[in-house]
Amino acid sequence: MGAILMSLIPKLRGLRAAGVLAAAALATACATPAQKSATADTEYLLTVSRPGLLHVIDMKTDRIARSCELPGKFGSGALVPAPDGRHAFVLGNLWEDVYGFELDTCKLVFSARQSEGDVTVKTVQSLAVSADGSELYTVQNPVRRGADRFEVLQPRLAVYRIADGLDAKPVRSFPVKRRITKIAATAGGEVILGGADVEAIDVRSGAVRTVSALASWDRGPGWLTPDAFAMHSQGEHLNEYVMPYVTAKFADDKQDMASAEWWWGMSRVDLATGKAETREIFPFQFVIFSLVADPRDRNILYGAFNTLSKHDIAKRETLKVVELDHTYYSLQLSRDATRVYVGGAGSTISIHDSGTLEKIGMIQLPGDMSTADVRVAWRRP
């Protein structure tokens, strides 16, 4: 996390862990008796929990339809649904390998082991699928392990053909900058790279362009350089990519932090066009880990961490804030936008009415989600 957010988190209350045994029992009770294929399901909530399970949750009932066992050790839990709504890809095995599953059956249909020989590759949440569903993208951070030293190598965007199935190898790779976390594919053949700045890379040529200048912006001495944070992706329902950031507007040339106006801002990328808007959206009053927009009104955003909040960015106002029972990292909306699902960190997904933010339900998982994404897979008719 960026330096500004890190300095604030110790002031916030910590995570209260859930009972794993009780969670396992409840999760088992919620699942269908034979974990049957649910061909009528059109909307799934997806997440990953320890010890290594991809959970497919029926959003009509808010019950676990099935849980797919991940090979290897628990990873980051980053995941991305395919455009067809029938498959999902998960980053596992200590942030190194990618596994693709058929959501109806839990069949493993894709795998990619990124480490090889004396080179260990880690991917930090960077996982995306092309708009046509044919390619998978990761940002690889390789390190060569020697007898007495580690050699940090050039990060790269790796491109895989999903049709290559198990034990797939990259078909192309291109050098990229460090600090890249969440990524997303555009309709025009680019991948959005969330790092110090928001950039886009052409997946055929490797050409890179700046989408939103953040760390490199030039707004003069009256503004603090933004501290951007990209961990979780929540924009598939609107085909967008959102990068939140924190900045400050100073009162004078003294650049006094105490008297400055602190703001949340965001870079918002339209994945259909690859174009972005970057602006301040509401005052900074508390830490938010993730933002998701309401499809009924794109000016309404929800945020989560120790609180669940609702914001009108047209008015640059915070409309409502409710305390959560523990820390959460990620959130999503149902397709009709009437329910907010807040997950990550612990072993529970908290369900809230999107109008009042009142808690209306909970989904218990058999283990904590840690840094796992919470994503929605919608099967088109």
Positions of predicted regions on the chain:
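Bacterial N-terminal signal peptides that target proteins for export
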Residues: 4-19
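Bacterial N-terminal signal peptides
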Residues: 18-28
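Predominantly soluble domains enriched in secretory-pathway, periplasmic, or organellar proteins
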Residues: 30-381
